[in-house]
Amino acid sequence: MSYTDIPAGNAIPDDFFTVIEIPANHSPIKYEVDKPSGQIFVDRFLSTPMFYPANYGFIPNTLSDDGDPLDVLVICPYPVSPGVVIRSRPVGVMYMTDEAGADAKVIAVPHEKLSSMYSNVKECSDLPALLLAQIQHFFENYKALEPGKWVKMGRWGSADEAREDIRKSVAAYNLKKEASK
């Protein structure tokens, strides 16, 4: 099955699906889903001995500014296995730039239907400051030992900005899909 068979969500932008590629607190291995086949490949072994501080994946059937599906970090109490789809809701967005250009990461929590643990979290600022610092530190440093690769942190955006980024990425995907017919 291809991940293009999975819709972006139930009620975009507040209830979306995230395909997990890398579990939280996992070994320093960067996995990527091959979108057409649905297979999970090892993209590379991170040169820095660091692990992703949250479950990392993407929203299917989206297209972000970097030409890939929109990236998501899902904050939850457990690592989620690669290839699993989790219902998510946005609480913010992290704007950054890397060697390939602009690269936004939606910050999300599990949808209320999955867990009430995060029902009080409406914005990134409702998350622990240490967790946000860990996320920022990870992305600012995880490419540091890879020649030609770099990341520059921009700013944290609101849940409303994340929702707008999700809407835009769904629209961009649909536009590209229509143009290819």
Swiss-Prot record:
| Cofactor(s) this protein requires | Mg(2+)
The answer, when asked if Metal-binding is one of the entry's keywords, is: yes
Q: Which reaction does it catalyse?
A: diphosphate + H2O = 2 phosphate + H(+)
Any Gene Ontology biological process = phosphate-containing compound metabolic process
**What are the coiled-coil residue ranges?**
none
* Enzyme kind, highest EC tier: hydrolase
The alphabetical list of record keywords is: Cytoplasm, Hydrolase, Magnesium, Metal-binding
| GO MF term (any one) | magnesium ion binding
- Identify the domain of life: Bacteria
Protein residues bound to substrate? K30, R44, Y56, Y142
Does the keyword section mention Lyase?
A: no
Which residues are noted in the entry as Mg(2+) 2-binding?
Answer: D71
Q: Which SUPFAM superfamilies match?
A: Inorganic pyrophosphatase
Q: What is its EC number?
A: 3.6.1.1
- Which cellular compartments is it found in? Cytoplasm
Q: Name one Pfam family in it.
A: Pyrophosphatase
The positions annotated for binding Mg(2+) 1 are D66, D71, D103
Instruction: Identify one Gene Ontology CC term for this UniProt entry.
Output: cytoplasm
Q: Which HAMAP family match?
A: Inorganic_PPase (MF_00209)
Q: Give the family per the record.
A: Belongs to the PPase family.
Quaternary state and interactors: Homohexamer.
Biological function: Catalyzes the hydrolysis of inorganic pyrophosphate (PPi) forming two phosphate ions.
Q: This protein is called what?
A: Inorganic pyrophosphatase 2
Which taxonomic lineage is given here? Bacteria, Pseudomonadati, Pseudomonadota, Gammaproteobacteria, Pseudomonadales
Gene name as annotated: ppa2
